[in-house]
Design a protein with these regions (language model features):
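Short, hydrophobic-biased segments on the C-terminal half of alpha helices
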Residues: 63-67
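Aromatic side chains
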Residues: 45, 71, 86, 97-100
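Beta-hairpin "wing" of winged helix-turn-helix
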Residues: 69-83, 88
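N-terminal helix-turn-helix DNA-binding core of bacterial DNA-binding proteins
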Residues: 14-58, 79, 86
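Amphipathic alpha-helical dimerization/coiled-coil segments
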Residues: 2-17, 24, 35, 91-115
Length: 115
């Protein structure tokens, strides 16, 4: 028989899955980008490449998907004739990140209780 805690954990995992499946955050690289921006506030795409391990084309694709989904915004800045692209979270991106942390935190607490 399944315990109430196990049932709650299963429901939390389902909720996390649903939250992520309705967004461009089905990619672990995109989730890492959102988490990095939540911590770093505003980052150059070159720095996001280092964090994720993605190449230039890949990071540009991930950033485009997140921007189209309304999770981040980008800004091109000229720097000695060399454009730099910065990314930062939108309110929607920050809200998603906070809800994701809340769900993961609850999952971890409940999992610890079930031991």
């Amino acid at each position: 028989m399944e315990s109430e805690t196990q049932n709650e954990l299963r429901n939390l995992l389902r909720q996390i899955s649903v939250e992520m499946s309705n967004t461009p955050l089905t990619s672990s690289s995109r989730l890492i980008i959102v988490m990095s921006l939540a911590i770093g506030r505003r980052m150059k795409l070159s720095d996001l490449m280092k964090v994720t391990g993605c190449g230039k084309g890949s990071i540009e694709n991930h950033v485009l998907k997140l921007e189209e989904g309304g999770f981040i915004k980008t800004e091109k800045v000229s720097f000695f004739k060399s454009p730099r692209v910065y990314a930062e979270l939108t309110d929607k991106g920050r809200n998603f990140y906070e809800k994701y942390l809340e769900l993961i935190g609850k999952f971890m607490r409940d999992a610890e209780k079930s031991k």
